[in-house]
Amino acid sequence: MADETKATDAGQRYAQSLFELTIENNQLTKVEADLKSLRAMVAASTDLRRLLESPAFSAEDKAKGLTAVAAKAGFQLLTAKFLGLVASNGRAGDLMGAITAFVEMSAQHRGVVTAEVVTASALTAAQLKGVSTAVASALGKTPEISTRVDPSILGGIKVRVGSRLFDASLRSKLDSLKFALKRA
């Protein structure tokens, strides 16, 4: 799989159907938590990843495996049925993209944006709160922030929200200065 987190058309349709069902049954937050948990399990387990990706397993085997994982993890019945349906229809390869699409739909429904914050060193709780407040006031939406440390930016901060990048890193400032000096 090239990028299993990108939703295919089929994955998008499965996500949309599940999203509508969760709204109808008032289970949005619970099902979203289940799917995020499954995404983390797949990221951590090569065996689970192999089950989803390998053509050596039949659709029926994949459905049984995912249903067993859902039962063991205590997922909602709706989540378990969704996983079984996707796998039994031969779409296990679209599952991670469907999860990504579902999480995005849920965030949009709740008025939340996902922001990735990159800094040269770890942020304190107060700094993180300040970044969260700044992003919220700039975009008018509640941010869900994930942080990453990248010493190569030297200092400052980079904030990515969707396709927008706010780059206030020392590395980018130095690169701009270097470019300006070369042109002079």
Swiss-Prot record:
Its main location: membrane. It is found in: Cell inner membrane. It is a peripheral membrane protein. GO terms for cellular component: plasma membrane; proton-transporting ATP synthase complex. InterPro entries: ATP_synth_OSCP/delta_N_sf (IPR026015), ATPase_OSCP/dsu (IPR000711). GO terms for molecular function: proton-transporting ATP synthase activity, rotational mechanism. It holds the Pfam family OSCP. Transmembrane segments: none annotated. The keyword Transport applies. Keywords: ATP synthesis, Cell inner membrane, Cell membrane, CF(1), Hydrogen ion transport, Ion transport, Membrane, Transport. F-type ATPases have 2 components, F(1) - the catalytic core - and F(0) - the membrane proton channel. F(1) has five subunits: alpha(3), beta(3), gamma(1), delta(1), epsilon(1). F(0) has three main subunits: a(1), b(2) and c(10-14). The alpha and beta chains form an alternating ring which encloses part of the gamma chain. F(1) is attached to F(0) by a central stalk formed by the gamma and epsilon chains, while a peripheral stalk is formed by the delta and b chains. F(1)F(0) ATP synthase produces ATP from ADP in the presence of a proton or sodium gradient. F-type ATPases consist of two structural domains, F(1) containing the extramembraneous catalytic core and F(0) containing the membrane proton channel, linked together by a central stalk and a peripheral stalk. During catalysis, ATP synthesis in the catalytic domain of F(1) is coupled via a rotary mechanism of the central stalk subunits to proton translocation. Belongs to the ATPase delta chain family. This is ATP synthase subunit delta. It comes from Caulobacter sp. (strain K31).
